A protein has these predicted regions:
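Short active-site oxyanion
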Residues: 1, 116-117, 171
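PLP-dependent aminotransferase-like
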Residues: 1-73, 77-82, 89
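Glycine-/small-residue-rich active-site loops that bind phosphorylated ligands and cofactors
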Residues: 31-32, 59, 110, 203, ...
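PLP-dependent aminotransferase class I/II
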Residues: 38, 42, 51-55, 64-66, ...
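Alpha-helix termination/capping residues and helix-transition junctions
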Residues: 46, 95-96, 112, 153, ...
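Residue-level detector of structured alpha->beta connecting loops
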Residues: 48, 75, 99-100, 193
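Conserved active-site segment immediately N-terminal to the catalytic lysine
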Residues: 80-114, 143-148
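Active-site PLP attachment segment
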Residues: 97-135, 158
């Protein structure tokens, strides 16, 4: 069993299913939109999972001090889904650096793009070595072609990698621009009842790669489609 938030893109849960593990979904905090620490603790005690996949949703970092303390005390591995959080920070440390393994996305709609694909990050060399092996069709290190286990073609081309690396120098500029866009929307909609934006904790700095908000139908006179127009 592997825990993950229900508020996430389907790829988070798919990664769990790919290895025939069972995803257990947990609720998110209504203000920060990241995983609820209370829900996480209850799920750990009830389901005794092998791992927890945290999700830095819309660039918002999770509370990793609390998560790591809780998970470490129950021998639960933390995997950080930082697909949306390149350039985001938690206590002045970059998202993508908190899990035993972490992933970043370079999909076409992300803050830096290679048109697709992403990156696996880990301080554990064995994890990286195994990932490189699997992503190149699990070919054994022989002169001839020999494969003893199922592999995948998850390689990124050198050209696309160069495109991504070229954008890294401007990452801070991109983050500042996205944060400004978020603040402009927040200001423009501040007088509309029932519109709520994600709350950024003082310990976090989001890249705000995607500006999102919720609408309380009991308080708002406008619906989603009207606000989009």
């Amino acid at each position: 069993r592997v825990l993950c938030p229900s508020l996430t893109f389907v790829a988070t849960a798919n990664a769990i299913k790919y290895i025939n593990a069972e995803p257990i979904f947990i609720d998110s905090d209504p203000h920060t939109w990241v995983c609820s620490l209370d829900a996480l603790e209850l799920a750990i005690k009830k389901y005794k999972p092998k791992a927890f996949v945290s999700v830095d949703i819309y660039g918002q970092s999770c509370d990793y001090d609390a998560i790591q303390e809780l998970c470490n005390s129950h021998n639960v591995l933390v995997i950080e889904d930082a697909a949306e959080a390149l350039g985001s920070e938690y206590k002045n440390k970059k998202c993508g650096s908190f899990g035993e393994m972490s992933i970043l996305s370079f999909n076409g709609n992300k803050i830096i793009t290679t048109s697709g694909g992403g990156m696996l990050v880990s301080k554990n060399e064995d994890y990286i070595r195994k990932a490189k092996f699997l992503c190149t069709q699990a070919r054994e290190p022989f002169l001839h072609y020999e494969h003893k286990e199922l592999g995948y073609n998850y390689r990124m081309s050198n050209l696309l990698a160069a495109v991504g690396r070229g954008q890294l120098a401007k990452l801070d500029v991109y983050v500042a621009k996205r944060r400004k866009i978020f603040q402009e929307y927040q200001k423009a909609f501040s007088d509309i009842p029932g519109v709520n934006f994600i709350t950024e904790p003082t310990s976090s700095k989001s890249n705000n790669w995607l500006t999102t908000f919720t609408i309380n139908p009991k308080k708002s006179t406008s619906n989603r489609n009207q606000l989009i127009k």
